[in-house]
Amino acid sequence: MVYLASLIFVLIVNGIGIYGSNCPDQQLIEKSLEKVHIPGAAIIVINATHTLYEKAFGYQSLLPKQPIDIDKSIFALASISKTFIAAAVMQLVEQERIDLDTDVNQYLSEPNQRIFHPDYPLHSITLRKLLSHSASIAVSTQVQYTYFQPGDTAFTESLAEMCFKYVNPNTSFWLPISPGRVTFYSNEGSTLAALVVERVAQMPYMQYIKENILKPLGVDINKVGARIADFLNNTDDFVKHYAYAFNSSDVEGWNQAIPSLNLTQRPVKS
């Protein structure tokens, strides 16, 4: 789980009709958040060169009530972090260090651990297929739940250990369709793409992201991390996770499946 301070809810400028000094309607935003039961959000509107609008709404904690702080609140990015994987891959493509349609095994340099679909060994797993979620990788939800543990014990395996454990021809975690013919959302496929970045760049994936994406954007890398330990001095700024549910059993089910999210039932208005 990757965390990033300050932002993080980006609205596309053209999509909400902001031109010149116009700003989004505050009441509309507040009503929209309330409608889908979001306790709080930090919103920023940007174009290619400027920040046009930024504002915090609601709370990062309901009990006790603690408002979202545009400069301090720390959000878990979850799957939004996949955009960083794609950006990193495309940087290496632009540098001609990798090719989107080359078999990823060429970059992994693991002669004794090749990754391929067991039923379609001649169909290469490529970065294009990984980034488009069309590599036919289908690790079960039940297995994915085992990744999540309370606190900093989540994801103790390295990228390589995780990839070669679950994405290999000796497992059953594959769709019965050849790679490239079907789209199926895959966390493990994205992780494999991140491993390629790590191997080609010859540095830890997180270090690559900080040095080649975040620092050039002017992001304070001291406020970015993948573990709670990266934020020992400001853990109070974590935005709490809430589940909207009509009964506590729903929340209990989520907490059993993904305890690291520490979900809390949101009060339901009468």
Identify the residue ranges that each predicted region occupies.
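Alpha-helical scaffolds flanking conserved acidic
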Residues: 74, 103, 124-128
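N-terminal signal peptide
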Residues: 10-22
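Short, surface-exposed loop or secondary-structure junction motifs
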Residues: 116-270
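Short, well-structured active-site flanking segments
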Residues: 52, 64, 84, 90-110, ...
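Classical eukaryotic N-terminal signal peptides for Sec-dependent ER targeting/secretion
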Residues: 1-8
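Short, conserved catalytic-motif segment at the N-terminal edge
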Residues: 22-75, 97-99, 112-114, 167-176
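Active-site SXXK
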Residues: 29, 43, 49, 76-104, ...
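Short linear capping/connector segments at secondary-structure termini
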Residues: 59-62, 71, 103-113, 144-150, ...
